[in-house]
Regions:
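Cell-envelope/extracellular polymer assembly enzymes that use nucleotide-activated donors
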Residues: 7-10, 38, 193
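Short, well-formed alpha-helical segments that are part of the catalytic scaffolds
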Residues: 17-31
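Conserved short acidic donor-positioning loop in nucleotide-sugar-dependent glycosyltransferases
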Residues: 29, 44-45, 72, 95
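A conserved acidic beta->alpha catalytic loop
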Residues: 43-52
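Glycine-rich, basic loop-to-helix element that forms the pyrophosphate-binding segment
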Residues: 69-85
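Short aromatic/hydrophobic "clamp" motif used to bind/position activated sugar donors
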Residues: 90
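Donor-binding/catalytic cores of nucleotide-activated saccharide
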Residues: 95-205, 213-230
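C-terminal subregions of glycosyltransferases and related glycan-biosynthesis enzymes
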Residues: 214-278
Length: 278
């Protein structure tokens, strides 16, 4: 690893048996207009040449770290990445996807322009073999409150935010302070659960639907394979999401309770005083 104290962004790329696609992902990162980022590749126990391909790129990035671990799933791999981040901001990148040249520059500059926002998001393309890239929505941008951002994450298929992690940039300090982790018991939607847990503790989000990320939809992807295990994982994820939302709202209600009681007490005292004077 060649560290640079001036780097602001870490790109966490978790990979597993992606020898067919990894070189493409890394080549596009090499073409970034802003190279002031660290690339952290977590190999989750690949049994093909994924690790060797990643290692061959080590000297081509300004800051690069490759970590190989036993296969435990994407959530555990991302959690290891969270433990290793040492830059102010970080973002996730899947090993079979690729990005536009402005990808890293956009996130770094967006946080510089919107320092009070705790998350920055971008738009994305959906890509399939033999088909042209399709942007997911029309260009829009702006700032969202906490609740607005949560609704976008939980929103429709054409939401410019959605629940993915790869089109979002996070503040490392906030994740550390809140001890946020990916749920390793979930096979699906662990990214959406993480995003809700994160957003419920934030002050706001800056979003743009300008597409900078290419989401490669593979026919053999686990996301597109239906099974009972996936069904129950989705059920568990939705339970976690709404528990997080209601827990935060309940805590917010309790935090206002002393003010409410003080107002009620003052109101009662004034009524007693009025009764004595009448």
């Amino acid at each position: 690893l060649r560290a640079n104290a001036d780097l602001k962004l870490t790109v966490i790329m978790t990979v597993y048996n992606q020898e067919k696609y990894l070189a493409r992902a890394l080549d596009y990162l090499l073409e970034q207009k802003n190279q002031q980022f660290k690339l952290l590749v977590i190999d989750d126990g690949s049994t093909d040449s994924t690790a060797e391909i990643a290692a061959s790129y080590q000297d081509r990035f300004q800051a690069f770290d490759l970590v190989s671990k036993a296969n435990e799933g994407v959530a555990a791999a991302r959690n290891l990445g969270l433990d290793m981040v040492d830059t102010p901001y970080f973002i996730f990148h899947d090993g079979d996807d690729w990005v536009e040249p402005d990808y890293t520059d956009y996130f770094i500059k967006a946080f510089d322009r919107h320092p009070d926002d705790d998350m920055v998001t971008c738009g994305y393309y959906v890509d399939q073999a033999g088909k042209p890239s399709v942007p997911i929505t029309k260009p829009v941008e702006g700032e969202l409150t906490r609740i607005e951002a949560v609704l976008k994450v939980l929103g429709s298929a054409h939401s410019p935010v959605k629940g993915y992690t790869w089109n979002k940039c996070y503040k490392t300090q906030l994740v550390r302070r809140l001890h946020l982790r990916f749920n390793e018991d979930l096979d699906l939607m662990e990214d959406q659960v993480f995003n809700i847990d994160y957003l419920m503790q934030t002050e706001g989000c800056y979003y743009s639907s300008v597409p900078l990320y290419h989401y490669w939809q593979r026919a053999d992807s686990a996301v597109h394979t239906v099974s009972w295990d996936h069904f129950w994982s989705i059920v568990g994820a939705n339970i976690s999401i709404y528990k997080s939302i209601f827990s935060h709202l309940w805590q917010k209600l309790l935090s206002k309770r002393p003010q409410t009681q003080e107002y009620q007490g003052s109101y009662v005292r004034e009524r007693i005083k009025d009764d004595h004077q009448s």
